[in-house]
Amino acid sequence: MSKQLRQSTKKTKRRLYRGVIHIQTSYNNTIITVTNIKGDVMCWSSAGSSGLKGKRKSTAYAAKLAAANAARKAIRDFSLREAKVLITGPGPARETAIHEIYKAGIKLTVIREKSTVPHNGCRPPKRRRI
């Protein structure tokens, strides 16, 4: 009559002192993802998940909120201390997001531009007439 022990289903907190922060900016939204060195996603945040909707998601303030939330989660849950930053996209709030991550206390080792530039590839959409 041995008792069966229950295993805890709680996730163990992993310590992640070094990581990669991906900043993906577009004209409509900013998405910030924190990964480990291998590329496994640890946490993420976006302007939409920070509580903003519609036109406000495309502002620099929205990117600032998203970056602060992602950095806070990374420090709190994984004790992230230093990170590479990879930036993708043409959005308006790239520097704001980087500055907010730096202000949160994460040491930035590398800042790399990863945006793709077409060599006159696809035809752009027609101009809007309002």
UniProtKB/Swiss-Prot annotation:
GN (gene name): rps11
Gene3D superfamilies, sorted: Ribosomal protein S11 (3.30.420.80)
GO terms of molecular function: rRNA binding; structural constituent of ribosome
UniProt record similarity statement: Belongs to the universal ribosomal protein uS11 family.
Keywords, alphabetical: Chloroplast, Plastid, Ribonucleoprotein, Ribosomal protein, RNA-binding, rRNA-binding
A single GO cellular-component term on record: ribosome
Subcellular location: Plastid, Chloroplast
Entry-linked Pfam families: Ribosomal_S11
InterPro entries per record: Ribosomal_uS11, Ribosomal_uS11_sf
UniProt entry tagged with the keyword Ribosomal protein: yes
Upper taxonomic lineage: Eukaryota, Viridiplantae, Chlorophyta, core chlorophytes, Chlorophyceae
PANTHER family, per the entry: 40S RIBOSOMAL PROTEIN S14/30S RIBOSOMAL PROTEIN S11 (PTHR11759)
Complexes and interactors: Part of the 30S ribosomal subunit.
Protein name, entry field: Small ribosomal subunit protein uS11c
Transmembrane segments: none
Source taxon at top rank: Eukaryota
Biological processes, Gene Ontology terms: translation
